[in-house]
């Protein structure tokens, strides 16, 4: 049953009702009042402090004359009337046990909110999912999705389609068994749950699963590709982003890395971690699944954004899905059946794979950059952060170009054995991270890169000192917007990547910019608040280079460019 209210908002050019910009997760906008010729005149219009520090990922929502803003832990939510944004209409500030923060990997972030049926759907780190009346903030329902006592927490932005709320838990670094959960939008009742590992019934494989590509694997593999019962603590959590095709009624997402990181402790392909899924929204049954990195040994959690487009393939308009994975590969597949069409390296520095075999879908590994116990891996590219992480990228349908925020970071990796203990980190590796080899001065760790999605080839690159963690926004005025870890919001010319405008915000940016229109005026919004995995050293005052799973050493200079904060800045002409 379709949500007419949400569908209306999705088709309203000036609204921003979904964290990724729409069902297709293209993160773009037809708004063009701000363009290349006048962007130099953009100024700060207003700002809002969340009153919370730590990393502020994601972006606010705009529905009608209301904006909804979230914060990092304790996951506060604020409703602002755009007629008077200085006044808070309502606020929801949950009380949570601070011990939850200790089991959250890589900062206490919150990636955003969802909207549907006149409700704001939010999650809390402590595993609770709630629906609030969008007008009053009253709690309509509240359910428990996951349990922090075993290391399972919520950081993902919920996703609403039709009468369903999709939600996944974090916690693969603590051995949490991943699953996608579907709840009734109006009641909060659990409709179905599909795990990443285990029996075919628990993974919810359709009878014709992977019938178009049986070489991807089909039945019984959620247990057979694991040693013993290791699949029960095998990770595969999904804390990233969803996309949805209303015509096919399929939704798409990625399951994450297997646990532990130490690959010696879990022989086998470890299905169905590291998989792109196409599932029926109503039943949760998987029509197809493509495992990008069998037996992942680098923490390349494949939960990143799935961008849906329709493009000609061999002369026929084809429904496609494109995905830049943490493993450094840009994939394009037929989203109806999972056929692999493109698999290209996003940067020449990628060395863990020599290539991806398009016939089998299997990556061809280079054993020199493996992480086995008898081999200390050095100069591994990408690092565990991936050449792409949680940032939301943008797509220009006219030029068929994807504008991506990338991390140009490599690593050394030393594994060690450890036992599983519920609620404790289950990693088994010590990492050192540092800039990749291809930057102009060999010190750059970030890129904004434009890709032709028909070929997977790069068009242009804009280098950044730090990882481009938050992703990009494309607006029809020909501008690519993004926030930087050192605190700038920037606008680039979409044709060549030339920087046309920037503004220094109060703290570093790890969220994804958004845009909306109100009373005939276009606005650009960007969260600020340094943190996330790159900012853990700054946020928690860590000095050991290997701390923060290797991030502290790579980003030790970040503290010289920005400090902690938390809020939203809004810009206009």
Swiss-Prot record:
Cofactor names from the entry are: Ca(2+); pyrroloquinoline quinone
Catalytic activity reads: 2 Fe(III)-[cytochrome cL] + a primary alcohol = 2 Fe(II)-[cytochrome cL] + an aldehyde + 2 H(+)
Q: Which cysteines are joined by disulfide bonds?
A: 105-106, 146-169, 381-410
Cofactor-binding details, from the entry: Binds 1 Ca(2+) ion per subunit. Binds 1 PQQ per subunit. PQQ is inserted between disulfide Cys-105-Cys-106 and the indole ring of Trp-239.
Q: Name one GO biological process term.
A: methanol metabolic process
The record's subunit annotation is: Heterotetramer of 2 alpha and 2 beta subunits.
Write down what this protein is called. Methanol dehydrogenase [cytochrome c] subunit 1
Q: Which organism is it from?
A: Methylophilus methylotrophus
């Amino acid at each position: 049953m379709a949500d007419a209210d949400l569908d209306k908002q999705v088709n309203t050019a000036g609204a921003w009702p979904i964290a990724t910009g729409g069902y297709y997760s293209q993160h773009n906008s037809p708004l063009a009042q701000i363009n290349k010729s006048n962007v130099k005149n953009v100024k700060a219009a207003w700002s809002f402090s969340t009153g919370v520090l730590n990393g502020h990922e994601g972006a606010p929502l705009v529905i009608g004359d209301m904006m909804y803003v979230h914060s990092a832990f304790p996951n506060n939510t604020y409703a602002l009337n755009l007629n008077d944004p200085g006044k808070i209409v309502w606020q929801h500030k949950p009380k949570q046990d601070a011990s939850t923060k200790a089991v959250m990997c890589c900062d206490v972030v919150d990636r955003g909110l969802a909207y549907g049926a006149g409700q704001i759907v939010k999650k809390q780190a402590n595993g609770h999912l709630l629906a609030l009346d969008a007008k009053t903030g009253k709690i309509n329902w509240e359910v428990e999705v996951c349990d922090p006592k075993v290391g399972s927490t919520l950081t993902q932005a919920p996703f609403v389609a039709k009468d369903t709320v999709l939600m996944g838990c974090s916690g693969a670094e603590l051995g949490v068994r991943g699953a996608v959960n579907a709840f009734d939008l109006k009641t909060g009742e659990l409709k179905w749950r599909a795990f990443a590992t285990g029996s075919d019934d628990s993974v919810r494989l359709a009878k014709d699963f992977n019938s178009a590509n049986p070489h991807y694997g089909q039945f019984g593999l959620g247990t057979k590709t694991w040693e013993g019962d290791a699949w029960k603590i095998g990770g595969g959590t999904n804390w990233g982003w969803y996309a949805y095709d209303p015509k096919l009624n399929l939704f798409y997402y990625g399951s994450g890395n297997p646990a532990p990181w130490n690959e010696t402790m879990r022989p086998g392909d470890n299905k169905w971690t590291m998989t792109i899924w196409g599932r029926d929204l109503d039943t949760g049954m998987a029509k197809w699944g493509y495992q990008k990195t069998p037996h992942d040994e680098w923490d390349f959690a494949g939960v990143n954004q799935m961008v849906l487009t329709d493009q000609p393939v061999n002369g026929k308009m084809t429904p496609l899905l494109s995905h830049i994975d943490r493993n450094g590969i840009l994939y394009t597949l037929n989203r109806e059946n999972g056929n692999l069409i493109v698999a290209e390296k996003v940067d020449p520095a990628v060395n863990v794979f020599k290539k991806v075999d398009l016939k089998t879908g299997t990556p061809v590994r280079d054993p020199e950059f493996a992480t086995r116990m008898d081999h200390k891996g050095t100069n591994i590219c990408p690092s565990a952060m991936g050449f792409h992480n949680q940032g939301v990228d943008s797509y220009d349908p006219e030029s068929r170009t994807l504008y991506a925020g990338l991390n140009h970071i490599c690593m050394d990796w030393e594994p060690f054995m450890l036992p599983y203990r519920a609620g404790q980190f289950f990693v088994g590796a010590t990492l050192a991270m540092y800039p990749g080899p291809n930057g102009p001065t060999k010190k750059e760790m970030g890129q904004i890169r434009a890709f032709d999605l028909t070929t997977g080839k790069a068009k242009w690159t804009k280098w950044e000192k730090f990882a481009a963690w938050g992703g990009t926004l494309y607006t029809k005025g020909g501008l690519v917007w993004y926030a930087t870890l050192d605190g700038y919001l920037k606008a680039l010319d979409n044709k060549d990547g030339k920087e046309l405008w920037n503004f220094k915000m109060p703290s570093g940016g790890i969220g994804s910019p958004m845009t909306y229109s109100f009373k005939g005026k276009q606005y650009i919004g960007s969260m600020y608040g340094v943190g996330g995995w790159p900012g853990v050293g700054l946020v928690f005052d860590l000095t050991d280079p290997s701390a923060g799973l290797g991030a502290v050493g790579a980003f030790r200079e970040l503290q010289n460019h920005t400090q902690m904060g938390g809020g939203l800045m809004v810009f206009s002409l």
